[in-house]
Regions:
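Localized chelating/binding microdomains
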Residues: 4, 27-30, 63-65, 73, ...
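Short extracytoplasmic
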Residues: 30-61
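Short, compositionally biased low-complexity segments enriched in polar/charged residues
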Residues: 60-114
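Extracytoplasmic/periplasmic, Sec-exported soluble proteins
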Residues: 83, 92-95, 108-111, 121-125, ...
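Extracytoplasmic/secreted envelope proteins and their assembly/folding machinery
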Residues: 88, 92, 130-134, 213, ...
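Mid-length scaffold segments of soluble, non-membrane domains
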Residues: 99-147
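Extracellularly exposed regions in secreted/surface proteins, prominently low-complexity, repeat-rich
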Residues: 146-239
Length: 239
């Protein structure tokens, strides 16, 4: 706490002699909130970052005109890794340039048991670095509209599950989203190891995969980057 306060411009003398300001300035509040968001990848339980289940809506339209909602189930969580360990070689340098701190991964299966998706949370020191990395990833993948697997997160196999044989060679579609100091990557493949279907000949399958990946990665990114309550007092019980 002392280090954090002094970094915000509160002197050691003020802290030790009870002369701390009664309220944070707006700039100090914003900095504290940014620190809290950037620390979540370290402080939150893995099961909170990667929920056991979550819902998404595939492109299917029901007879009554409504949309279908399916549940994605988490198969397992991989060990924390570096960018070099958890991402493709072609993106490691651009992620490291932004100060990649770690990659957290989990693998899910979709509601029909057809698709596997590995989600990778890449943590950066701040939102500016994450945004720059996301822009570089988008340029590298041609905007994400490609029949090829865009470079990104590597598949995370989960022993004893339907994803025990999920490897990089089985990846079909990859993309990413960015929120706050995080870039959330995902990659999807078939659960039964069938051959890749070119997107230009099966656009519906591509839409199914991206609705799954976009929905899951966006929910994880939103939770990690949600704004915390505004702090008011530096260590005091009330202002």
């Amino acid at each position: 706490m002392l280090i954090g306060l002094t970094a915000l411009g509160v002197s050691v003398y003020e802290v030790n002699n009870g002369l701390m300001p009664r309220k944070f300035t707006q700039a100090q509040q914003q900095q504290i909130m940014a620190w809290e968001v950037a620390a979540r990848w370290r402080e939150l339980p893995a099961g909170t970052i990667f929920p056991a289940t979550t819902t998404y809506s595939p492109p299917t339209v029901l007879e009554d005109g409504g949309s279908l909602t399916l549940t994605t189930r988490r198969l397992g969580i991989a060990r924390q890794a570096t960018c070099q360990q958890a991402t493709d070689p072609s993106v490691v340098s651009l992620l490291d340039r932004g100060g990649c701190e770690a990659v957290l991964r989990a693998t899910y299966v979709d509601g029909t048991g057809t698709f596997l998706v590995t989600v990778g949370v890449v943590a950066f020191p701040g939102a500016a670095q994450a945004s720059a990395a996301q822009q570089a990833l988008s340029r590298l993948s041609g905007g994400g509209q490609s029949n090829l697997v865009a470079p990104g997160v590597r598949a995370a196999a989960i022993t004893g599950t339907a994803a025990s044989g999920f490897t990089d060679t089985r990846r079909q579609v990859s993309s990413s989203v960015s929120e706050g100091p995080y870039v959330v990557l995902y990659t999807i493949g078939y659960a039964d190891n069938r051959p890749k279907v070119p997107v230009d000949t099966d656009g519906y399958t591509y839409a199914e995969m991206t609705s799954l990946g976009d929905g899951l990665s966006s929910k994880i990114a939103d939770k990690l980057s949600a704004q915390p309550p505004v702090p008011h007092c530096p260590g005091a019980s009330g202002c």
